[in-house]
């Protein structure tokens, strides 16, 4: 069975797995105080050109989102996100479970617009009863978005400017950051991203690691007592070496960026195949997620040979499905899918 339904179906990149094997019998202290975690943090700071950044390795994406948002907000505040943002629609209420509301504004192909954000905050404070409602206390975006689209440098800078004006932090979800940075259309580098937000995370789970995300506080220092707060969210591994070793490997010799390029190369090949077969795209995306409108009978036929992801109903006879590539996708996989299509 071919795997095109998501970008976390496989285990770890062989180099990451080998690093885990090579260090397996080393006794190391726990909870992220080991030498590999310290080395990984330093490599990440160097890659971000942010020597003073506070870096923490958490177990997964939901935990990273829930933990960071909770750390940023007062009890009476919520986080502003596009209505299609991951925390708004695909986190099973994890943010709300932590006591914070997700405040949604319009999304356009997965992205919020700076002017909508400014208008939302302006209208909030124009309301004479605003103290009786949930305050906008942080802003959430992702790179890439839930729909595989990208913020340009100008778009992200405009959102950041609103956040700075309103004195609220900007948080960038980077679950698929390797794939975003590798896209031809991306005009943001990792060091530039560190300058365009207050905190972001570098995705590992979807980008070559077995698990783990690296949270980087770059435009601000981490709030007080981060470790107990991370632990309260179940995001702190006792065997912190597991994420430390993986991110040490990912940020050695440019592996993280190589992983991104591999996924984008196969995504481009996949896009060409889908176009050649005459399929209609729900929207055009430059990253590793491709969204196609399939006749329902075609979807059923393809699923006999390849795993693809249901996204949404398009009409009574068509469905929007997602095809994903990852670091593990090969040209042979693309050729095999082409034969199925």
Task: Give names to the regions the model predicted.
Residues 74-76, 268-341:
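Conserved C-terminal alpha-helix-loop-beta "cap" of PLP-dependent enzymes
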């Amino acid at each position: 069975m071919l795997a095109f339904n998501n970008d976390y179906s496989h285990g770890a990149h062989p180099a990451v797995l080998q690093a885990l094997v090579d260090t397996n019998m080393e006794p190391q202290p726990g909870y992220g105080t080991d030498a590999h975690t310290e080395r990984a943090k330093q490599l990440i700071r160097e890659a971000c050109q942010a020597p003073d950044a506070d870096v923490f390795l958490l177990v997964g994406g939901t935990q990273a989102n829930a933990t960071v948002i909770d750390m940023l907000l007062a009890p009476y505040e919520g986080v502003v996100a596009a209505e299609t943002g991951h925390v708004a629609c695909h986190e099973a209420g994890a943010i709300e479970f932590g006591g914070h509301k997700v405040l949604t504004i319009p999304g356009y192909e997965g992205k919020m617009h700076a002017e909508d954000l400014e208008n939302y905050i302006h209208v909030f404070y124009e309301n004479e009863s605003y103290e009786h409602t949930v305050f906008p206390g942080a802003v959430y975006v992702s790179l890439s978005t839930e729909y595989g689209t990208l913020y340009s440098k100008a778009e992200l800078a405009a959102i950041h400017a609103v956040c700075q004006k309103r004195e609220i932090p900007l948080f960038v979800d980077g679950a698929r950051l390797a794939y975003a940075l590798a896209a031809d259309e991306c005009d943001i580098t990792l060091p530039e991203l560190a300058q365009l937000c207050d905190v972001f995370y570098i995705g590992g789970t979807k980008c070559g690691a077995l698990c783990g995300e690296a949270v980087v506080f770059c435009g601000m220092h981490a709030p007080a007592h981060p470790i107990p707060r991370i632990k309260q969210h179940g995001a702190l591994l006792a065997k912190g070496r597991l994420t430390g070793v993986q991110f040490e490997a990912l940020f050695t010799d440019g592996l993280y960026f190589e992983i991104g390029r591999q996924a984008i190369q196969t995504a481009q090949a996949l896009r060409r195949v889908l176009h050649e077969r005459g399929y209609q795209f729900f929207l055009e995306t430059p990253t590793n997620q491709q969204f196609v409108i399939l006749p329902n009978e075609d979807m059923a036929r393809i699923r006999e040979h390849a795993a693809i992801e249901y996204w949404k109903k398009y009409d009574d006879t068509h469905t929007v499905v997602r095809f994903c590539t990852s670091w593990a996708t090969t040209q042979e996989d693309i050729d095999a899918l082409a034969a199925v299509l």
